[in-house]
């Protein structure tokens, strides 16, 4: 389970809310919650899938496939949330508001269109960054070809495979004020991808203002400066 360095109770840090749960509705004074276990890249074993279904049925929850490649259990009573997490035995999908929420991944090696088996990179980024505290909520997208079926250009950070290597993008958003990501560099090797991404994340974490999306940060300091600082500290 997640450690205690994140939001102590509700995802927003509200002491009155159950830990790692999102308030859904208040109807006639009754509050219901949703929980979302972490499923890296949307890949799940049959045993995990059965466990989620069994726990949801036991606590009268409703299952919902999410846009983040996860399965949410909705309609839970507050007192049942801790029991649900204990019985699932899985990491929370979202650990705090301003953190890396997920790493979207395409099927890659399972897709005939893939130019690179980007799953290795996606799983490594998930292991390295999921739940890490950032200036603002952060989403990562990884795709094995330029079709970018994980909406990479709408993610804060993206990695796209191509015949000539990998491309890294940054600053995308599909939220209230959509923004298309900027291409930071292309034709990277797998090793170079990690150098660039690690440098980019550290740079944003150190210099971004609290609550400032990566795209807004890039606009504030300028794309040219952002690219120069990232690339000079990573591969140039």
What are the roles of these predicted feature ranges?
Residues 11, 16, 38, 43-44, ...:
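Conserved active-site/ligand-binding neighborhood in enzyme cores
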Residues 23-29, 59-65, 173-174:
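Short, flexible, solvent-exposed loop/turn segments with mixed acidic/basic and small polar residues
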Residues 5-33:
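Intrinsically disordered, low-complexity polar/charged tails and linkers
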Residues 142-147, 216-224:
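A glycine-rich phosphate-binding loop feature that marks nucleotide/adenosyl-phosphate handling sites
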Residues 2, 144, 153-213, 227:
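Mobile "lid/hinge" segments at catalytic clefts and subdomain interfaces of large enzymes
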């Amino acid at each position: 389970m997640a450690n205690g360095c994140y939001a102590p109770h509700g995802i927003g840090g509200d002491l009155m809310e159950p830990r790692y749960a999102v308030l859904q509705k208040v109807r006639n004074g009754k509050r219901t919650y949703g929980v979302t276990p972490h499923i890296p890249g949307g890949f799940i074993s049959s045993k995990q899938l059965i466990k989620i279904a069994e726990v949801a049925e036991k606590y009268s929850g409703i299952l919902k496939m999410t846009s983040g490649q996860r399965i949410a259990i909705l309609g839970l009573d507050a007192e049942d949330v801790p029991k649900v997490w204990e019985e699932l035995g899985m990491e929370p999908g979202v650990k705090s508001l301003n953190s890396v929420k997920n790493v979207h991944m395409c099927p890659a090696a399972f897709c005939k269109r893939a130019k690179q088996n980007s799953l290795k990179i996606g799983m490594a980024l998930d292991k390295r960054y999921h739940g890490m505290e950032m200036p603002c909520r952060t989403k990562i997208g990884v795709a094995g070809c330029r079709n970018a079926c994980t909406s990479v250009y709408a993610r804060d950070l993206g990695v796209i495979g191509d015949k000539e290597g990998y491309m890294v993008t940054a600053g995308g958003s599909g939220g209230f004020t959509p923004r298309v990501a900027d291409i930071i560099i292309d034709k990277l090797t797998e090793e170079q991808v990690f150098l660039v991404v690690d440098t980019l994340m550290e740079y944003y974490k150190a210099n971004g203002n609290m609550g400032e999306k990566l795209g807004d940060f890039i606009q504030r300091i300028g794309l040219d400066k952002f690219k120069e600082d990232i690339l000079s500290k990573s591969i140039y």
